[in-house]
Amino acid sequence: MELKNKVSNLPSKPGCYLYLNKDKHVIYVGKAKNLKKRVSSYFDRAQNLKTTRLVREIADLEYFVVSNEKESLLLEENLIKKYRPKYNVLLNDDKAYPYIIITNEKDPTYKYVRKLDKKAFRSFGPLPIGSNARETLITLQRLFPLRRCKGNLGKPCLHYFIGQCSGACFKEVNKEYYQEQIKRVDNFFKGNINEVKTLLTNQMHKAAENLQFEEAQRIKEQIISLDFTTTKQNVEFKSQTDVDVISYFIEDEKIAIVTLFYRSGKLLFKDEHIQLYFEQDITDLIDSFMSQIYDKNILPDKIIVDNEVELFDLNEKYKSISTHPIKEDEKIIYKLATENAQEAIRKSKISTTINIGNENELLLELQEKANLQKEPYRLEMFDISNIGNEFIVGSCVVYINGKPARNEFRKYNIESKFTSDYDRLKEMLYRRFQKALIEKRMLPDLIIMDGGIIQIHAAKEIINALGLSEIQVIGLVKDEHHNTSFLIDTNEEQVIIKDKPKLFNWLSSIQVRVDEYAKSGFRKKQNNSFLKSDLEQIEGLGKKRIQDLFKKFNTINEIESADQEELFKILKNKKALDNLNIYLKNRK
């Protein structure tokens, strides 16, 4: 049935609709109280005003009828997670922001989490990603000690001896002690950090007097790293409440959505999201954005959104806490959020102009240069990094519609006995695509191998064996200086790409990214290997327990900041844990 007839025959019932392009990729998922009315509005709007980018790409549609709006909301969220359409609001996995929590126990402890524990006694955050949140956790553990061991050990733990545990390991700790410590932590996160700075400064001077200069420098860096929570704000809320302010700015088929996170009236941090815009309903768009944010993060006391956003549906979902800017301070801060969204669009334009250009143009150029049968909406590039036969790590970077999809990047530990890159590549590619088939994940339109004919043949051997011969394969070859040189197309012929500067720079950036991603995995594996050798000297650990530690924790710093109960669950041996604690203490 033709698309026009499908639209005219849609039912006037609630449901979800999916738009597909000519390659049968789902490019947009939406929900509607009335399917016929909503879907028809897209095409009517396109004829009456202008043909939007989305409408130009729609080749087919599918739909699901549901009983009510609540069902359509849940279905829409699941379909977006499944297909990750390029025209929907798609937030990366890193939108699960870090939090520091205090557990709700008789003897509470601190924890650093990404997945919120709703049973926590206190939750502090969300904290900016890359904000030294773990350093802040260590600072709190040292200055305002709660329980830092399993508790009820019958004798003081190591952390108690160095003043970093409440003593729940060997004695009854009164409730008033914890109340006082938590009150001091509350004050710290409200921006009252004079006490913290004084304590740290005293520790720094003491370390310097004892000629412990490395320790003094580390404490100094801790003091500096606390600034992200306490920077003096030019604009603050008069009330001491938690407020999120969500604004947006639209220009040239792009929308920037900016969220300002205020905690206890002070701006904690700002988050930006930019994507394509095609005149979709702004309430639906903000609703979808909020669904993904608050699916993984704590709801504040209030959410302020634009006057254009209808509040009825939002307040049904978010407990009547959504509002338009009404008070004077709310209007001022909302204006600030809008200005930040405008600036995000401006920076995006500059970045696009300088670095690459229009992604669609690049994909079309690549299609032509590499002799591809279709435009590569999704491409995956593979590389391997190693020293001889040690620390072998494979990497895969994924680009969707010309942009990196970082949450889909993957590293592969290559443990096989093969000594040739050809066989190692085959192992990585087999694992990658066998799993994709089993889990019914989206497959790439194009595979780019970091290398030449040998690497291309390794890829073709695997995809043909798995019945995936429709996936196209090309190679990107480096020169003797390890810089991008030329492309090998689908006919396995060399193609010069330097005559297309934007395409060349873009492909070169992908090659650098996959190379660095592989090397980062290799370096981590190498460092962990050296560290594991060091840890093997600790009595009671052994290779198996060390492997178990590194399955749970990525670095020695994460092991150091873990609570004792968590470490004991892994080691299952008190003497091994005691020896590990002594090692961690002595390495500082």
UniProtKB/Swiss-Prot annotation:
SMART domains assigned: GIYc
Signal peptide bounds: none
Protein name: UvrABC system protein C
InterPro entries, per database record: GIY-YIG_endonuc, GIY-YIG_endonuc_sf, GIY-YIG_UvrC_Cho, RuvA_2-like, UVR_dom, UVR_dom_sf, UvrABC_protein_C, UvrC
Assembly with partners or alone: Interacts with UvrB in an incision complex.
Gene from which this protein is expressed: uvrC
GO biological process: nucleotide-excision repair; SOS response
Keywords: Cytoplasm, DNA damage, DNA excision, DNA repair, Excision nuclease, SOS response
HAMAP family: UvrC
SUPFAM superfamilies hit by this protein: C-terminal UvrC-binding domain of UvrB (SSF46600), GIY-YIG endonuclease (SSF82771), RuvA domain 2-like (SSF47781)
